[in-house]
A protein has these predicted regions:
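N-terminal secretory signal peptides
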Residues: 8-63, 113-125
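N-terminal signal peptide c-region/cleavage motif recognized by signal peptidases
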Residues: 2-7
Length: 125
């Protein structure tokens, strides 16, 4: 009977703390964050102006997240926040499609193309 009492008094084993993995340091993250912000802006403006393929920008962002942040939730959060920031920045300024909204969309689309080219030419495989 003493052995049974001794087994019941024993504390459960202490599990070691799980330390989250440090986020990966990616040399092109700054440019990638800017690209995500630009994609969010272009997505909003193209949808606002009913431009062809307006919804494909969000799909492009999802593909970017899937390929770049597969097992990195912190990076995914940062890129998603950048996309949302770009979207909201123009949503707070433009509620109608105006000539300046069209010009802004074109400029941002060109910036996005430049960023994508820089990232892939410098860091692509």
């Amino acid at each position: 009977m003493a052995a049974v009492a001794w087994a019941q008094d024993k504390a459960p084993p202490v599990e070691p703390e799980t330390i989250p993995a440090a986020p990966a340091i990616v040399p092109y993250d700054d440019k990638l964050l800017r690209l995500a912000e630009v994609i969010g802006s272009v997505h909003y403006l193209r949808t606002l102006c009913k431009a062809p393929g307006g919804s494909e920008w969000r799909s492009d962002m999802q593909r970017l997240l899937d390929s770049e942040t597969k097992d990195e939730p912190q990076r995914k959060e940062k890129l998603t926040a950048a996309f949302n920031h770009g979207y909201r920045a123009f949503a707070s300024v433009y509620t109608d499609c105006t000539p300046s909204a069209i010009v802004a969309e074109e400029r941002y689309r060109n910036e996005g193309a430049t960023l994508a080219t820089e990232i892939t030419s410098r860091f692509g495989n």
